[in-house]
Amino acid sequence: LYMLDSDVKVSNSKYTSVNPIVFGIKKSKAKELGFTNKTVKTKDIVNAISNGKLKFSMSNPTSTNSGASAYLGFLYTLAGNPEVLKKENLQNEKLVKSLTTLFTGLERSSGSEDFLEELFLNGNYEAVVTYESSIININKQLQQQGKETLYAIYPVDGVSISDSPFAYIDNKNERAKEIFLDLQSYILSNEG
């Protein structure tokens, strides 16, 4: 379903969740890098990678939402957060160099967020770029296994956000719309 199709009417769209894309770094590594006692910018992460002090894993930007969102977030912050990314931004040598440097730190990529979590939990990786909710899930599992947990880094110069809208596809059925609105109201409530 594509919301811009002219014959499909979507209404009552509301976000049911908002999930930032963050760096999860093993706490000891984050502390070693000085990331636990200061505000961290994306360039700080790039510098750590450039100095050979940080490697990370993430989902593939060409096949996953979190990977694509992370990539676009990196582009925007390393380009200086322009209102709109333009061709001249993308051709800027400093941006290309920073982005290239950032991705020299990519140790492993995966084709899905679930597989990325599994890879991280079963491997010996020091950092992962993924949804905040995935970092929380990974940390729960690491705690259960008695392993070191991750420290979430939210770069102050920009974080990509993944949102989840819940909308009604209008088929002119008032009873169905009523049921939808009740369900949506419940999902957005404290009990939901």
Residue ranges and their predicted role:
Residues 1, 29-31, 61-66, 133-136, ...:
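Solvent-exposed loop/turn segments at secondary-structure junctions
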Residues 1-63:
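N-terminal segment of the mature folded domain
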Residues 3, 40, 44, 65-69, ...:
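Extracytoplasmic/secreted proteins, especially bacterial periplasmic and envelope-associated proteins
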Residues 15-23, 49, 62, 96-102, 110, 143-172, 186-192, ...:
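Periplasmic-binding protein-like
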Residues 28-37, 76-85, 172-180:
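Short helix-loop capping/hinge motifs at secondary-structure junctions, enriched
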Residues 52-80:
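Extracytoplasmic/periplasmic solute-binding protein
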Residues 76, 81-154:
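Ligand-binding pocket segment of bilobal, Venus flytrap-like solute-binding proteins
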